[in-house]
Amino acid sequence: MSRLFRGATIVWVVLRYGLDELVLTSFQKPWLRLLARIVSFGRKLDAPRGQRLREALERLGPIFVKFGQVLSTRRDLLPPDIANELALLQDRVPPFDPDVAVATIERAFRRPVGEVFVSFERVPVASASIAQVHFAIVRDRHGVEREVAVKVLRPGMLPVIDNDLGLMRAMAGWVESLSADGKRLKPRQVVAEFDNYLHDELDLIREAANAAQLRRNMERLGLVRIPEILWDFCHPEVLVMERMKGVPISQIERLRAAGVDIRQLARDGVTIFFTQVFRDGFFHADMHPGNIQVSLEPGSFGRYISLDFGIVGSLTEFDKEYLAQNFTAFFRRDYKRVAELHVESGWVPADTRINELESAIRAVCEPYFDRPLKEISLGMVLMRLFQTSRRFHVEIQPQLVLLQKTLLNIEGLGRQLDPELDLWSTAKPFLEKWMLDQMGPQRLWREVKAESPHFAKMLPELPRLLHDYLHHKPHDHRREMQELLAEQRRTNRLLQSIIYGGMGFVLGLLALQFLIRIRFFH
C-alpha cells in the first residue's frame, strides 16, 4: 500500500512540473505522443525543463535529490541545460532528533553514550539525507582525550531507499522499453549505479576504510590533512574520526586575510588530485567546496583538509594509460591517436569506422585551440570526448566518468581561487613521469621487486625440479618414441593387409576370368 501511495505521489509531481512532456514526446508509438499532447493541453510551463526537473526532485525528497546529484555527474548522457541544473541540487534536510542519534550510538556499542564518550554535543553540526555529524570528546586506548567528529546514520533509511529504488527501477524499465531516447540514456544502468552508490554510503565502515587508505597515500605529500579514523569506535552505523578545524575553502577573502597564498593553494589542489590519480590510482571523488577546508593551525598552515569519503574512485593501470595518452595526444592534436586509443580500449564496436570517429573527435577538440592553454578545461575535453564516443556506441567505464566529474570540480575550484590557473602546466609533469615510469627501467624494477617473494620461494626448489626434469624427460621421450613406433608398426601391418588383400582379390578375378575363357573356347 505504501509503495502504491508513493507511486501516486511521484505521478502527481511528474504531472505538476511537466516532466511527462520530457518523456512522452520522445516515445515511438503515435498514441503515446498523442497522450502527451492531451495531458499537456492548456498547461503553462514557464520555467525551463532543467529547472522543473530539479524542483520536482527536491519535492520528491532526499533520495531523489541524491539521485539527481549522481545523475548530474553523467554529462556524457545528459543535455548540458539539465546537467547544469541538477548540479545545483543541495543535500540539505532537517536534522533528526538527537535522542535518536544517542539511541543509535548506544545500540551500536551496547553501552550508554556517557561511557562511550567523555562528552557528546547533542546539537548536530551538519545534517544530510544519509547521516548527521556531532562533535564529541573520546578517551582513546592510551587514555588520551581527543576531540572527534561522530557521524551517525539516519535511522530507518534502508526501507525508504529500497522502496524508492524499486519505483525507480520500474520507471526506468518502462522508459527504456518505450522510448528510443530513453534507451540511449540507459536509465536502468544509471539506477543500478545509484543503487550501488546508496548502499555503499549506508555502510560507514566502508567510508572509514576509504579515509584510512587516502590518509596513508597522502601522508608524505604534505599538502593535505585527512582525519584519522578511530577504529575502536567505528560501526556500520557510527563513524568516529579526528575532528578537523579549518576555514571553508569558499571563504577566499578570510583565507587571504589570514595570510594563505591563494595562488599556491589552487596549484596544490591540482597536485593533490593528479597525485591521487596517476600515482595511487585511488582518488577522492566528492571534492566540492563543502567537503574541503584549509588549515590555519601553525603545524599545517595553508594545507587542505579533506572531508566526507563516501565516494572514491579507483583506476587500473589501463585506465591511467588511457587518460595519460588521451591528454598527451589531445595537446599534440593527434586525433588519429585519440581514435586509436578508443579502439585499443576494446570499447568500440567491431563495425565502427575509425576515420569517422577520428573526424568527430577533431570536430570536438579543434575549437579548444583558439583559446590560451590556461582557459582549456581538461574536464570539459574528457566530457566532450565521452559524448562523442557515445554517438559511436562506445561504452565508457563508470570510473572514468566519475574521474571526469571530479576533474571538473577541481578545475572549477582551482579557477575560483586563481583565474589564471593553467591546469595543463600542472598536470603535464605527472603525465610525463607516469609514462616514463611505465616505459622505463623503473617499471621493470618494480615488477622484479613485486615478484621477488615468489622467486625466493621457488629458488630452493630449482635444483630438485631440474633433476626431476632431466631424470624423467629421457624416459618420457623414450616411452613416447616406443608408442610412436608401435603405432607405426600397427599402421604398416594394416596397410600390408589392405595391399595384399587387394592384390589377391584382383588376381582371383583374373584367374576366374581366365578359367571362364578356357571353358568358353573349349
From Swiss-Prot:
Primary location class: membrane
Provide the Protein kinase domain boundaries. 119-497
Pathway linked to the protein = Cofactor biosynthesis; ubiquinone biosynthesis [regulation]
Q: Is Methyltransferase included in the keywords of this UniProt record?
A: no
Q: What is its EC number?
A: 2.7.-.-
Task: Spell out the catalytic residues.
Answer: D286 (proton acceptor)
What compartments host this protein?
A: Cell inner membrane
Question: What do the Gene Ontology cellular component annotations say?
Answer: plasma membrane
So what does this one do? Is probably a protein kinase regulator of UbiI activity which is involved in aerobic coenzyme Q (ubiquinone) biosynthesis.
What HAMAP family does the record tag this protein with?
Answer: UbiB
Record protein name field:
Probable protein kinase UbiB
